Design a protein with these regions (language model features):
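Helix-to-loop junction immediately C-terminal to a conserved catalytic motif
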Residues: 68
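Short coil-to-helix segment of the ABC ATPase nucleotide-binding domain corresponding to the Q-loop/switch region
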Residues: 112-121
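Catalytic Walker B motif of ABC-type/P-loop ATPase nucleotide-binding domains
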Residues: 179-182
Length: 284
């Protein structure tokens, strides 16, 4: 079965495809004998929210690191705004990364710094702003993620979901063009997950950024994505808008959506242990 390699979503008015903000073609990366990315090709349109799903160890985080220039591919192409990322020198890559805001799994906050100082950190490094301008921007970002009034608190005084949102505020503080979310809802309860999803949707709507999110959480993926792509065994095996993705007949997609233990995705998993003896069957 040939693997679908769709490009960025068409323009609704003209039917033409917009120029990709992110263009990835035949991307390959191995670590020693292990092939992690095996010919990944996908485009992300300007202001699109792409969600990449897939099991643990399928290369989702490795793909993000190539987009931002933290890893260099073995072969293939990664372009952002038409610029080949791997060709950037040290000085150029520093400037290039200012295009991005990245929110990590656990927030990745500085524990010894207040919320305010955490959010202000990229502004102090990347922007020439007065103290008053920085304070105004920090308060604006905290309001965007629904965290008014917590600026003086330490990360240890916040819940897990609040720490994630502080990470979001820091990620958008310097007004990036592209947002990368790494497992934004992992380990959170369903109510907090729904709130995180609402905040991501609000940020996308307000800031019009191009967004790439990696997640295991299918309900979250269906809520926040304009398009969902599935990575398995080093390849993009399917991609479609959320409602179309739900209806895809590919058994790998359906196994992942429904969280089934048995199916084609389980073929590479180690064999399950033999069934335990029933209780009471042990010899004394």
């Amino acid at each position: 079965m040939s693997e679908p390699q769709q490009s960025a979503r068409p323009d609704a008015r003209s039917g033409a495809r917009p120029k990709a903000k992110i263009h990835i073609a035949d991307l390959r990366k191995s670590f020693g004998p292990k092939t992690v990315l095996d010919g990944v090709s996908i485009d992300v349109a300007p202001a699109e929210s792409l969600v990449i799903i897939g099991g643990s160890g399928t290369g989702k985080s490795v793909l993000l690191k190539h987009i931002i220039g933290l890893l260099k591919q073995d072969s293939g192409t990664v372009e952002v705004d038409g610029t080949a990322v791997e060709k950037l020198g040290n000085r150029e890559i520093t400037e290039f990364r200012r295009k991005f805001g990245m929110a990590f799994q656990e927030g990745a906050l500085f524990d010894s710094m207040s919320v305010w100082k955490n959010v202000a950190f990229p502004l102090q490094r990347l922007k020439k702003l007065s103290h008053g301008e920085i304070r105004e921007r920090v308060e604006e970002c905290l309001t965007m993620v629904r965290l008014e009034g917590v600026g003086e608190k330490l990360p240890s005084q916040l819940s897990g979901g609040m720490r994630r949102r502080v990470g979001f505020a820091r990620a958008v503080a310097h007004e990036p063009e592209i947002l990368l979310f790494d497992e934004p809802t992992t380990g959170l309860d369903p109510v907090t997950t729904a709130l995180i999803d609402e905040v991501i949707l609000d940020l996308n709507d307000r800031l019009k950024t191009t967004t790439v999110t990696i997640t295991h959480d299918m309900e979250s993926a269906f809520r926040i994505g304009d398009r969902i792509a599935m990575l398995a065994r080093g390849k993009i095996i399917a991609e479609a808008p959320p409602e179309e993705f739900r209806r895809l007949e590919d058994p790998r997609v359906q196994q992942f959506i429904h969280g089934r233990a048995d199916g084609p995705l389980s073929e590479d998993a180690p064999p399950r242990e033999s069934q335990r003896e029933p209780r009471g069957s042990e010899t004394s």
